Structures are given as C-alpha cells and as structure tokens.
Amino acid sequence: MGRTYIVEETVGQYLSNIGLQGKAFVSGLLIGQCSSQKDYVILATRTPPKEEQSENLKHLKAKLDNLDEEWATEHACQVSRMLPGGLLVLGVFIITTLELANDFQNALRRLMFAVEKSINRKRLWNFTEEEVSERVTLHICASTKKKIFCRTYDIHDPKSSARPADWKYQSGLSSSWLSLECTVHINIHIPLSATSVSYTLEKNTKNGLTRWAKEIENGVYLINGQVKDEDCDLLEGQKKSRGNTQATSHSFDVRVLTQLLLNSDHRSTATVQICSGSVNLKGAVKCRAYIHSSKPKVKDAVQAVKRDILNTVADRCEILFEDLLLNEIPEKKDSEKEFHVLPYRVFVPLPGSTVMLCDYKFDDESAEEIRDHFMEMLDHTIKIEDLEIAEETNTACMSSSMNSQASLDNTDDEQPKQPIKTTMLLKIQQNIGVIAAFTVAVLAAGISFHYFSD
C-alpha cells in the first residue's frame, strides 16, 4: 500500500482555479510535512510563467515533455527559502488536458528528481535513515479538475519505480499545527586557509558553515526550559482545552545549548593554519518551526528547529552573495574593512493557517517589494500589514588581510556607526592570493538564548 497524503481543502480549491489559458500545461510545487504514517500538504503554488513562454504557445504542443527544469528548480529553491523548519517541498504537480496525460509522465518524474536534487544541494543537513524518502507527483485533468494519478518515487533511488498514493482532502488541516520559536546567537569564525585561495568566498563560507552545523546538530535543546526524552510526546504534560478547541495553538519556547568543553575521551589539539583572511558571522537569528499536532514527538520538534537554524543562516549568506554578485563593483584595494548588512527575516501568515512563511529583506527594500515577491513565488495574495519583521538590522564588517599569516585571533568586533554600503566580489583577488574576511551580523530579536563557544 502506498503513502497517504492528507491535503488542506484550500489546496484543492487552488488547483481547481488554475486554468491553462492557452498553455499545454501548468506545473508547480506541493508543500507540507512528512511523517512516518502520512504526509500533510498545506500549500500548492504554480511555477511563474516565463515571459517568452507566451510567445511560444503554438510550439508547446509539439514538445510536451520539455518542461523547463531549470526554471522550475530555481522557483523551487526560492520557495524552499521561504519555508520555516518542519515544512518541505513534498513534490510537484502538473495540470494538462486528459488526452495529454501519458505524454507528461516521464517529464513529471524527471522534474520531481531535479527539484529535490537542486534543493538538497544547498542544505547544511542530511535526511536521516528513518525519514520518509518518497516524494509525490500529482497529475490533474484541466477540464474535470480531478486527479488523473498520484504517485510517489523514492528520491534516494533514481531508478525507483512509481508507487500509487492516496490523495485525500481535509478541511481545517492548516490550523492543526504547533509552533516552536527560538533566537539563536551565533559567532562563527571561519579561517580562510592560504591553500584555499582558488575557492570562491561563497564556497569557503559554506565549508565553514558545514563545520558549525555539527555544533547545532549536537546541541542540547530545552523545550519550555526542560530537557525532554526525544521519544516522548511533545504535548505530554500539556493541559488540553475543553470542547472543540484543540491543543493546536501551543507555542513552545526553545533554547539551544552548545558544547562548552570536550571531555577527556575527546582530546583535541589546536591547529595552526596559514591564513589569508577569515570570515566571521556574528549576531542573532529568529527561528521558527512547525509540526503537525497529531502525536508529535520531541525528536521531531527538535529536528525541525535544528534545520530552521541551519537553513536561515545558510540562506542569508547565499542571498548576500547573490546580491553582491548582481551589484558587482570593483573592490577598494586600499580598504581593510567593508561593511555589509545581511537580510533580515520577515514572516507572513499563511491564509487560514497558524503556520507562518518567511522571506528575507534588505534595508533598502520596501514592504511592497517583499509583498510582491511573496505573491510571485507563492501565488497567494498577502497584505502589507500582515508582514512581521522579526528582527532588527545590524551591520557587518569585512576585513582584508593583505599578507598571509598564521592566525588564531578572533576578528575585530569594531563596527561603524552607520552601515557602509560597499560591495564585495565573490572571488576576491585570487591572483595575488588575497581572500577578504568579513563579519556578517545575522540579525536579532526576541526570546533569550544561551550560547557557549570554546
């Protein structure tokens, strides 16, 4: 027997309202949460059409299996950034006429694997062996609005065959979620070895974040001030409300403790590197995660929080690098420090749901731009007044080291009174072996948090 997908009714309404409008097909993403017993789908969003597609409608029918995978996977990566901990892109859907159904089966399968591969490549974490590895493909008839087929594939096996799956609609699914919130203070020092000058600054930073991710993975997580057994029910000890009001409005405060000292069984020696610079990420991040209220386990809640911490830090760095690349200007050779501001997190409620999605905003971006980006990526209307800016803006410093030297020092905490809006190249003077170091302030707010570093 295949997997069961419990789907929010509004998702069905959304899919029914999508018309082909002269196109051969419309494709998009399915978003929700996996569990051992069943999966929950709370959102669907179609892939935005390319401008040039409207000019090629006459030729689409001749190339039915040529879905634009690059365009669709880029949309999936953008949407993945907007998901808090606990939510994933669960699969893809496509809407066609009934007579074209068979022509799209292979294309839909390829698209599903391409989307998963593209999203997974950017993550700082890996799925566990116990987690569900199946992703769904949904094919809908454009005229009847009914399901043609619903199938799953094992993403760990590129040669896996399709398995049938149940697709069941349920009202009120989006309100049955528990939220977990925490604010994580970070101070990540990433030395840039002189031997890694051929790498881009982005790649060096990603390598450093991968090492930091192990600290987050191995941390101790307090839920409402308590350490709980990972196999316990998250709602154990919680008072349940009477009547029809379920215990779905609960919000949990999570605090993270990272290892302070190594015990005698894990001795370590200091490593001295010849460095051309260093990267220091410093500040605080607001994290949120959601899990469905049906028999939630502590380990599932902790895992969702961990992944949100890792995702939001990695995503902000990636967004900053993209912004610097788009606005590329020559580097100031006489400048030892440059200051940048990482984007801060903005939350918005999913209509009719207790779940909030997120986006990232630079200081010079308006609320209207963020609203428009939400609408473009998620194909849902939101109001500016619903935007919740969860963090305050901090500055970030970039220091260049013009001479390679052995360094174990922390970066200077000095910051300017005003952010200096200079840009930095992704590849910094590799021909002379100079890699810049910069400090990124990763944005603040909210709940207290204890962070210990060596």
From Swiss-Prot:
The keyword Membrane applies. It is found in: Membrane. One of its GO terms (cellular component) is membrane. It comes from Pongo abelii (Sumatran orangutan). Belongs to the ODR-4 family. This is Protein odr-4 homolog. Keywords: Membrane, Transmembrane, Transmembrane helix. May play a role in the trafficking of a subset of G-protein coupled receptors. Its main location: membrane. It is a multi-pass membrane protein. The lineage of its organism: Eukaryota, Metazoa, Chordata, Craniata, Vertebrata. The chain crosses the membrane at residues 82-102, 432-452. The keyword Ion transport does not apply. Pfam families: ODR4-like. GO terms for biological process: protein localization.
